[in-house]
Design a protein with these regions (language model features):
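His/Asp/Glu-enriched short active-site or ligand-binding loop at hydrolase and phosphoryl-transfer sites
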Residues: 251-254, 260-264
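Active-site SXXK
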Residues: 85, 97-128, 134-136, 166, ...
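Active-site-adjacent helix/loop patches that line small-molecule binding or acyl-intermediate pockets
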Residues: 37-56, 125-238
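Short amphipathic alpha-helical face segments that pack within enzyme cores
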Residues: 104-109, 217-220, 311
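Structured C-terminal helix/loop/strand segments within mature extracytoplasmic catalytic/sensor domains
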Residues: 3-67, 87, 185, 226-249, ...
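Short, conserved catalytic-motif segment at the N-terminal edge
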Residues: 68-96
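Sec/Tat-exported extracytoplasmic proteins
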Residues: 64-71, 108-118, 129-131, 167-173, ...
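Solvent-exposed coil/turn segments that connect beta secondary-structure elements
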Residues: 80-84, 93-95, 112-113, 130-132, ...
Length: 325
C-alpha cells in the first residue's frame, strides 16, 4: 500500500471522527434509586462549596493570563470533578489541532468492535516503519521513554499489542497499521468505526470537515471511560490501564505526586513550520477525589508548553488536595 493510500485512510478516520454526536446513558443504583435520568453518584455525593469552584476558576484565569503574556500564545483548560460532575473551564470551547489525541477514540472504536468480534484482537498485522514519512515522527523535544516498546520493524503483531503501543508509546507506526487494517482489510470496518466514533461525540458535528477539538469535548472521552459507559467494565479498565502506563511524563504527570496514577494521552503538532501545539488530557486519580483535566496549548517553544501544562496540573492538584483534607 502506498503512503498516499495510507494518508487517505487516515482522512477517512478523521472524517468519521468528526461526525460525532453525543452519548447518553442512564445510571440506576440501589443506594440512590430516586433518579432515572441523571447520575445518582453525582446527586448523592456531598456537594462542594460553590466558592471553591469560583476560586479554582480565578486561579486558572490568572495563570492562563500570565502564561499568554509570557510567550505561550494560547491555553485552554477543562477540569471536571468525577464524583459530583462539576466542571471549571478556561477557553474551554477554543479549537485546537487534535494531533495524536485522535489515537484514543480510534482505539476505543476498535476495542468496541472486539467486544462483538474477539478474534480481531489476535489478528496479526505488519508493523512497517517504511509506511510513514519522517514528518510523522514525534519531535525529539517531546521526551518520553520508548525503551519498553519492543515492536520491531518488519514483523507482525496482534492487534491488541498494536492498540497498547498506540496508547502507551503514542506509536505512530502501530496506529497507522490499525487504520490501514480497519479501513481496508476488515469487512465493514470503516462503517463500524464510524458508528462507534459517532457515539463519542468529541468534535462539533455542525462542521464535520474540521479536524479540530476543544478541551471540553475531548475530556468527555475520559469521563465515558471512567463510567464504563462506552466499553464494558473489563475493556474500560484495560484501556485506562494502558493510559496509566503512558510514557510521556512531562505534562499532567509532572504536576502530581509520583504515587498518584494518571491515565493520560498527549498530542503534539507543528504547524506552518514554527507554530507548535502540545496537549495533555486524562484522569488524575487523586485518592479522595479523582478528576479529569485537559490542557491544550499553542506557542513557539516546546519547553514553555510543557512547563505550562505541568504547572497547571500542579495548581489543580494542590487545590483539589486542599479541599480533600
Amino acid at each position: 500500500m502506498t503512503k498516499a493510500r495510507v494518508a487517505w485512510g487516515v482522512s477517512i478516520a478523521l472524517l468519521l471522527f468528526a461526525a460525532g454526536v453525543g452519548l447518553y446513558t442512564v445510571f440506576v443504583h440501589d443506594h440512590c434509586s430516586g433518579y432515572s435520568f441523571i447520575s445518582p453518584d453525582f446527586a448523592c455525593s456531598p456537594a462542594m462549596p460553590h466558592a471553591w469552584y469560583v476560586g479554582l476558576k480565578a486561579s486558572l484565569d490568572a495563570y492562563v493570563a500570565q502564561a499568554t503574556d509570557g510567550g505561550v500564545s494560547e491555553v485552554a483548560v477543562y477540569y471536571r470533578d468525577l464524583r459530583e460532575g462539576t466542571s471549571v473551564g478556561v477557553n474551554a470551547t477554543n479549537d485546537f489541532s487534535p494531533a495524536s489525541l485522535l489515537k484514543l477514540p480510534v482505539v476505543l472504536a476498535i476495542v468496541s468492535i472486539a467486544e462483538r468480534d474477539a478474534a480481531i484482537l489476535t489478528r496479526e498485522l505488519p508493523y512497517d516503519k517504511g509506511s510513514l514519512d519522517a514528518e510523522f515522527d514525534i519531535p525529539a523535544a517531546i521526551n518520553f521513554d520508548n525503551a519498553g516498546n519492543t515492536l520491531e520493524d518488519g514483523k507482525k503483531y496482534p492487534v491488541e499489542d498494536l492498540l497498547r503501543a498506540t496508547l502507551v508509546y503514542s506509536d505512530n507506526y502501530a496506529y497507522f497499521a490499525l487504520l490501514k487494517f480497519i479501513n481496508y482489510d476488515y469487512p465493514g470496518g470503516t462503517q463500524e468505526v464510524g458508528r462507534a466514533l459517532q457515539e463519542l461525540g468529541v468534535i462539533d458535528p455542525r462542521d464535520p470537515s474540521e479536524e479540530t477539538v476543544s478541551v471540553r469535548n475531548y475530556s468527555g472521552i475520559f469521563r465515558i471511560l471512567y463510567q464504563a459507559a462506552f466499553l464494558d467494565a473489563d475493556n474500560s479498565e484495560r484501556v485506562l490501564r494502558w493510559l496509566v502506563e503512558a510514557t510521556f511524563k512531562e505534562g499532567l504527570i509532572a504536576g502530581v505526586p509520583a504515587s498518584t496514577p494518571v491515565a493520560t494521552k498527549f498530542g503534539e503538532r507543528v504547524l506552518d513550520g514554527e507554530a507548535k501545539q502540545l496537549h495533555d488530557c486524562g484522569i488524575v486519580y487523586h485518592p479522595q477525589n479523582p478528576y479529569t483535566l485537559c490542557i491544550m496549548t499553542k506557542g513557539s517553544d516546546w519547553a514553555g508548553l510543557k512547563e505550562t501544562i505541568s504547572e497547571i496540573s500542579a495548581l489543580v492538584y494542590k487545590e483539589v488536595d486542599s479541599r480533600a483534607q
